Every structure is written in structure tokens, then in C-alpha cells.
Amino acid sequence: MAINAQEISALIKKQIENFQPNFDVTETGVVTYIGDGIARARGLDNAMSGELLEFSNGTFGMAQNLESNDVGIIILGDFSTIREGDEVKRTGKIMEVPVGEALIGRVVNPLGQPVDGLGDIETTGFRPVETPAPGVMQRKSVFEPLQTGLKAIDALVPIGRGQRELIIGDRQTGKTSVAIDAILNQKGQDMICIYVAIGQKESTVRTQVETLRRYGALDYTIVVTASASQPSPLLFIAPYAGVAMAEEFMYNGKHVLIVYDDLSKQAVAYRELSLLLRRPPGREAYPGDVFYLHSRLLERSAKVSDDLGGGSITALPFIETQAGDISAYIATNVISITDGQIFLQEDLFNSGIRPAIDAGSSVSRVGGSAQIKAMKRVAGTLRLDLASYRELEAFTQFGSDLDAATQAKLNRGRRTVEILKQPLHKPLPVEKQVVILYALTHGFLDDVPVDDILAFEEALYDYFDAHYDHLFETIRTTKDLPQEAELDAAIQAFKAQSNFK
């Protein structure tokens, strides 16, 4: 058989033309320093800020400081096996977390990996942890109420869907209990809840998860935990991971409640990282961009326009104060970013007023427009009445003689304080809150002994459930009060057959 040189030449040329080089080109560097969750590496000249980098042991890090001769990296995981001289390579991606329905009911770390021992999470969706907040024209005004189930909040400092409401107070004043009760009250409200535990003890997180499970709230809740024993980078990244998971639902037209427990610990973790990365310290040794740390997180909570699905993220960030000082650096930063604050006071907590909400220092800047009409009508003057009672109470400690009008105000004030108390993990539907506050503001409790107020309240609910359920139904469906004459008659009928005189 004759060999045709031209044919062979043409064949070789064709092969060369069709050749696709299959090189895997990655930029690699060398670790020059490692310790305390921080690494420095040389040779990553083209690394991007926030880019995910992979170490030779499979651990990932995030590029933070891009300097002329090296890159400062925060390590997102175990750094005990990383050594100086180890290889680190660029991935070309920024950090993402898994998102979607599969995460609901699970406990995950800030990387989206399950830590509850219930197996892998099957999801294909991912979102970057750092994304721009919705712009002005992409937002809508807050107008839908978010009922927490706590009378003191829903009446005095109402929260709307899409709002950021700070919960601030000393340690052990019931901040977490307020948020957990708010989550429990979202059952059947078509809300997804995300609880982000930052720097908490693992035993504490376990207790909260068990509480959510016991009351059936884990069916619509994701728990993101970065416990106190984990490296600072994970504490720093946890809130951003939580809000990335929330954004997936918001941009699909759903409503989300996200709790950050607490942002003081995130600020401390960020200060630690910044000092280790040798960034210049500012006030209280926090870096200059600590305001931006929290503003870029909380601005991602919003009520978005109908064009984007009309979903919302409502944020309840926590700040822990020292000796009730709400004028501290981080506290004032977050107060200025949020749409209001609920201030929990240690003195009130210790005197048995729980939730220990200080009505004078607490405010909701946008929630009033989201409050239902019935609640507006019964709770309109409640805040002023309470403030006036506190003032009179302080004055009467001097033992002055009181006229009848002042005595009546004091009596009403004592009953108001009693009515606003609420047992732990027993959130109330809004229609029950409206009825008891109506009874209070219309003088039906003025002749009930203060010690019997809570028993009166329970008995009133039971009586209405049995005989006047249609009044509850009216408030539920119309969001307004039923006929006042009918409501008055129902409460009078209850008082006539009860032992509360």
C-alpha cells in the first residue's frame, strides 16, 4: 500500500488546528505567616478583595488585606495543620453559601455546612455572602405588621415587615427570649425565620434549638451558629451568611425574620481580626470601618418593590450594653443604622417586669404605619399613660396627699404595667392582645385587684373563646375593632359571672 505524504501532512495539520490545550492554570502563593486565624501569603499578586483562597490542606481562606508584597488572609476553618511554606492558591470566586428550602429546619455553620448530625443538605442554590443592598427605587415603604406576640412590643413599639429593630440591653435581661418568642409567634404566618447565634456558648445554642423544636418552630427556621469556641473569622462572617440565606427567600417574594444574637460579639471578632491584620486602630481599638461592618449588613434588610417579588427581610439585631450604657460606640452606631430600638432594663427585669421593656427609651420609627387599626385604637395613648404613671410614681414616693384624679392615674398605671407582663414562650395572637388592652383602656380593670390581673386576663380569653369567638374572628379578619357596644357587653358579661370584682 502506497503512503501518500500529502494526505498524512493534511491529517497532521488538521489535528494541530483542532488541538485544544487543556491547561489548568492557577495562581499560587506561599504562606509566610500563620497564627490566630490569620495567614499571610506571597505570590498572589492578582488576588481580589474578598476572594476565596484554598490552602494545601483543603481549608479555605478569604483575602482581606491586599498589600504590595503580600496578602492578609482570614482562615475559615481549622488552621492547626497549616504551616509556613505551604502552598495557597486562588479560586477566582468570592465566598458563597448554600441557600434554599433545604436549609429550613437545619442547624448550620457560617459556611452552610450542617452541624446537627442530620446528614448532608441537598441544595443546588448558592449566593455570595457579600452583595449590595437594594437601592432606593427597589424598596417599598414598610406597611405590613410583623406580630411578635408580645403585648409590650406590638402595642408600644410595633414592628413592620422589612424593618430593622435593635434589641439592646445588658446581659441577662431577656434579649434572646424576646426574639425566640417573636419566632414562635410566626407559626402559620407564612414567615421564614433565621436565628444567627454569634459567639454564644454551644450549650446555649442547643437550648434555643430544643425550644424551637419543642414548639414546632424549627419547621420554618434556619439556625446559623458560630459558637464562642470557633475562630474569629467565622464569627465575623456568620451574620453575612445568614442574610445571604434570607435574601434568597426575599427575592422570591417571601417574608423573612432574621435575628442576629449578637452584633457586639461580631464587632469584637472583627476588631481582633483587624488588629491581627495590622490595620490602624481607632476609638476603643475598633478599626475605622466598624460602622460599615454593620451598616452594609443591616441595609440588606428591606421591603422590596413588587417588581422584585414584594418580599421582605425584617432584622432584629442585638447589642449587649455594659451597665445600661446605650451611648457606647457600637451601641450608638447600630442605633443610628436601625429603624428603632427596644431597650431592656436590668432594674425592670429584676423587679419581675418581663419582658423588661423600658417604654420611655424604646421607639419604633416606621412600625406605626404597619400597626393594625384595632391596635392603634386601643394602644394610641398607652405610651403617654405609662410615661405619666412613671412620673407620678416617682413623685408619690415623697408621701404627698393625692387627689382622686392622681390616684386614678396611679391605679390605671399599676394595672397597665401588670397587663404588659407576659410569661416566657407564650406569645399572644393580636386579637387577644386587642381585647385585653381594650378592657384596660376603657376602665374594665380599674376595680380588679392588681394581684388578680393576670388571672383575670387568662379567664377573659377562655370566656371569649367559649362564648364570643366571633369577636376574635372580627378583629382577625377586618383588622379593626368590632362594635364597641358589643365588646363592652361581652366584657361586662364576663365580669358579672366571674369572681374578679
Curated annotation (Swiss-Prot):
Site (Required for activity): residue numbering on this chain: S362
Name of one Pfam family that matches: ATP-synt_ab_N
Keyword Cell membrane belongs to the record: yes
Disulfide cysteine pairs (residue numbers): none
Intracellular or extracellular location(s): Cell membrane
UniProt keywords, alphabetically: ATP synthesis, ATP-binding, Cell membrane, CF(1), Hydrogen ion transport, Ion transport, Membrane, Nucleotide-binding, Translocase, Transport
Superkingdom of source: Bacteria
Enzyme Commission numbers on file: 7.1.2.2
Molecular functions (GO terms): ADP binding; ATP binding; proton-transporting ATP synthase activity, rotational mechanism
Membrane topology: Peripheral membrane protein
The protein's name: ATP synthase subunit alpha
